[in-house]
Amino acid sequence: MIFIDACFRKETPYTPIWMMRQAGRYLSEYQESRKKAGSFLELCKNSDLATEVTLQPVEILGVDAAILFSDILVVPLEMGLNLEFIPKKGPHFLETITDLKSVESLKVGAYKQLNYVYDTISQTRQKLSREKALIGFCGSPWTLATYMIEGEGSKSYAKSKKMLYSEPEVLKALLEKLSLELIEYLSLQIQAGVNAVMIFDSWASALEKEAYLKFSWDYLKKISKELKKRYAHIPVILFPKGIGAYLDSIDGEFDVFGVDWGTPLTAAKKILGGKYVLQGNLEPTRLYDKNALEEGVETILKVMGNQGHIFNLGHGMLPDLPRENAKYLVQLVHAKTRR
């Protein structure tokens, strides 16, 4: 698989490409599948439809990897927190984590309840071409904790940060509990058939450097170390969004570092490129315009050259991006990097 070879810095015939949120609302096929499911959460839980949605971007765009269609919040959901998705607002937990007692009340072994995810993986792997990789994923302990403490997405993360500074032992207990679940969750994804795993630390930039390293990065390192110990042949990709200023403190046992669009690739390559393969980092809104897209691709390829790079966006696809431009991006990257 070209994608897996690239994760391990092996020679590839061209630079592989996939896109975060490549299965999404910009595709009419996705919207049809979602309509059939009835709701976003039901789409995640319906393995037949989730498989359909996972495969759509591979078939339509020609990307080199599929990423499992699911949501990072299925883990806290199965740990016992009631989750709903409010239209135009996003995810909302009906209960929140406020103290040690509420951390202790979370169910252990939630990963055993996620058979709908593992079924999606095995179905997708059966239908996916052998040359194409399937990526599994989860959210980072810190990012999941913020949703569980705030009850929803936040601009200030005030409740989470208040806990971090005034009751660090409560937050640590939650992060520890989540880490153990996530290790087993990703392990079962691997056993079900994924070829690589990715951990999304979407709210990494909410923390100052020392707090980030202690309350997020340390847990990411713990998870990736255990996964590499168990499955050395499976690439681990970490994507901590918005920590470009902390790159000099990044270390650990993983294979690929996801670079967001706000972090200059030149800096990421200089600091991390010798040790990790870099993934990224086209600004997603460049896909609105073909000239802007071409310019962005040119800049990235000039910096990264032929090896140690997986092409991706620096954040997820937006719902109204033109699908023909997404397809053009894949063709352009393949054509420009073919060797």
UniProtKB/Swiss-Prot annotation:
Record-level GO cellular component terms: cytosol
EC number of the protein: 4.1.1.37
One Pfam family it belongs to: URO-D
InterPro entries reported in the protein's UniProt record: UROD/MetE-like_sf, Uroporphyrinogen_deCO2ase_HemE, Uroporphyrinogen_deCOase
Site (Transition state stabilizer) location in chain: 71
Top-level lineage group: Bacteria
Known pathway: Porphyrin-containing compound metabolism; protoporphyrin-IX biosynthesis; coproporphyrinogen-III from 5-aminolevulinate: step 4/4
Reaction(s) this enzyme catalyzes, per UniProt: uroporphyrinogen III + 4 H(+) = coproporphyrinogen III + 4 CO2
UniProt KW keywords: Cytoplasm, Decarboxylase, Lyase, Porphyrin biosynthesis
Assembly and oligomerization: Homodimer.
Task of the protein: Catalyzes the decarboxylation of four acetate groups of uroporphyrinogen-III to yield coproporphyrinogen-III.
Name of this protein: Uroporphyrinogen decarboxylase
Source species of the chain: Helicobacter pylori (strain ATCC 700392 / 26695)
